[in-house]
A protein has these predicted regions:
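Surface-exposed amphipathic alpha-helices with a cationic face
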Residues: 35-42, 108, 134, 243, ...
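Active-site acidic carboxylates
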Residues: 1-88
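Active-site flanking residues adjacent to catalytic metal/cofactor-binding acidic residues
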Residues: 6-8, 52, 145, 385, ...
Length: 511
């Protein structure tokens, strides 16, 4: 059976600036997430219902809210960004998408497997719709948390908790689609010769060679905790160079896929001598890269649709920078500061103006203007504004000096001055807006982790992008273990493990 997707009030009146109940940046941020949701659901045969406010001129609701979304005005139109996703428009006058509309009749005819509810506002129309769907109509309901929002983050959080804990709706996060062309990883000769290996694997292969034993063996790899798969492309590149082409079978999860504790993520079947000495190497690749990607994903989830970039290059050894930043992008970061990481991900590096340039030039405005003169136009003009003056004042000074060319400001207030706070972000936004610089975005960095990111979100701070460093770069690797489960087709395992192949329908054959 198909699903039914209820898109509540994703219309111009709430999503476009200048209208009385425009939700601001919070609404704009969920548009790409809703687009991805609809793309997936349309491809799988689901039916889309756009439930849109259509109020009369004398609607009683206008005693509570200012007049909005009056029938016959452009405010009631579905936003242009969703024009490419076919669905039925259902006008509504009440909070619930079911109240005095044709939605109930449509769903009875469709008999959907489940309802997916997205849009605005989390604590008003979404909550009332989910309440009727779960409590009165007994539908299975999913609410993708990154596809709903409202005016107030405290009420947003309360409504989500109520839907899950009281009404029985399932809160889900949209699956990430890692849109990265698989990099061409260079496997060093030292890897192929076994230099990174634990010596006992080298000795094991040598003993088996001298004994004339080279059985076809199946090795399964699993993690110690849940996380995000990363390093698989590189591990598979290594395996493609060491396994015999005419006698190998490899199954794996894809880069960027989530995994659970003890879930098999990689299964290798080949003559043991071909890969036995390389266990340390492919486990190390998966462990470190999956740890970085998982830390990045934790930040992405906390950010609730606000972009996150990786700024952790300075915290790792130069030889590891590219892998770390690439893993952060696999985890969901929109980009990174290092050339090496961006190159692996097929992107351009992202950066701002550093303190060093500002201090040497003696002025943030002077440094920003010099940056603007000498950098190519495709490089973003983002000024660091905590060097010499208070951040709101410096932001306005630089924006005025740049005369419309400034794209963003970064707040990186040090701990000696209390770090960046939600109130500081709000003040900076207010002064920029007051001086006509509404399009200048605010980037926040400095000691960010999921908890700090949630603090900004729950405080309603108008952050446009988070830059995360050491939380990603310094994260603990995820331990991966490799165990033999078959030798020459016969199930076997060490004590404490189950012999034979461990089923996992999520694995795909890659060799």
């Amino acid at each position: 059976m198909p699903n039914a997707v209820i898109v509540a009030d994703v219309i111009r009146g709430f999503f476009e600036q200048g209208n009385p109940l425009y939700l601001g940046r919070a609404a704009r941020r969920i548009i790409p997430n809703i687009q991805q949701l609809l793309e997936r659901e349309v491809a799988s045969g689901s039916k889309i219902f756009y439930c849109c406010d259509h109020h009369a001129h004398d609607d009683p609701e206008f005693e509570i809210f200012p007049p909005h979304c009056v029938a016959g005005t452009s405010e009631v139109e579905v936003i242009p960004e969703l024009a490419g996703y076919p669905g039925k428009v259902i006008p509504k006058r009440h909070y619930s998408c079911f109240a005095d509309t044709s939605l109930d009749k449509e769903l009875v005819a469709l008999q959907p497997e489940k309802l997916i509810v997205c849009g605005v506002c989390t604590d008003i129309c979404i909550l009332h719709t989910v309440s009727e769907a779960c409590y009165y109509r007994n539908y299975e309901v999913e609410v993708p948390v990154d596809c709903v929002t409202t005016f107030d983050q405290t009420r947003h959080k309360f409504a989500l908790e109520h839907m899950e804990k009281v009404l029985g709706a399932k809160l889900v996060s949209s699956p990430f689609e890692v849109k990265i062309t698989p990099p061409q990883f260079d496997i060093p000769a030292s890897f192929l010769s076994g230099e990174p290996a634990d010596i006992y694997f080298i000795r094991t292969v040598e003993i088996l060679r001298r004994e004339g034993l080279n059985p076809v063996a199946t090795m399964e790899v699993f993690p110690s905790r849940a996380g995000i798969t990363c390093g698989m492309h590189e591990a598979l590149t290594l395996l493609s160079k060491i396994l015999p082409e005419d006698n190998r079978e490899v199954w794996a999860l894809s880069e960027g896929e989530p995994f659970q504790r003890k879930e098999v993520v990689l299964r290798i079947t080949a003559p043991y001598q071909s890969y036995g000495a390389h266990e340390t190497t492919y486990l190390g690749i998966l462990s470190q890269c999956s740890g970085w990607a998982t830390a990045a994903r934790e930040c992405i989830n906390a950010a609730q649709g606000i972009p996150v970039i990786s700024f952790g290059a300075r915290h790792v050894h130069p030889l590891a920078v590219g892998r770390m930043d690439y893993a952060a992008i696999v985890g969901g970061c929109i980009g990174c500061s290092s050339i090496a990481g961006a190159s692996l991900a097929g992107l351009e590096p992202i950066g701002t103006i550093p303190h060093a340039l500002i201090i040497i030039m003696g002025s943030t405005a002077r440094a920003t203007l010099a940056f603007d003169r000498h950098m190519p136009p495709e490089v973003s003009r983002i000024a660091l504004v905590d060097t010499f003056k208070d951040e709101p004042e410096e932001s306005v000074i630089v924006a005025q000096a740049m005369e419309g060319r400034l794209q963003g400001v970064r707040l990186d207030t040090p701990s000696e001055r209390g770090r960046v706070t939600a109130d500081l972000v709000k003040e900076t936004r207010a002064w920029l807006d007051l001086n006509g610089f509404r399009e200048v975005k605010i980037f926040v960095s400095g000691g960010l982790d999921p908890e700090r990111i949630r603090y900004f979100i729950e405080s309603g701070a108008p952050v446009d992008t988070f830059a995360v460093g050491s939380y990603i770069s310094d994260t603990k690797p995820i331990d991966f273990t490799a165990d033999l489960h078959e030798v020459e087709g016969k199930p076997i395992a060490k004590r404490g493990r189950l012999p034979g192949i461990t089923p996992n329908p999520r694995l795909k054959r890659v060799m």
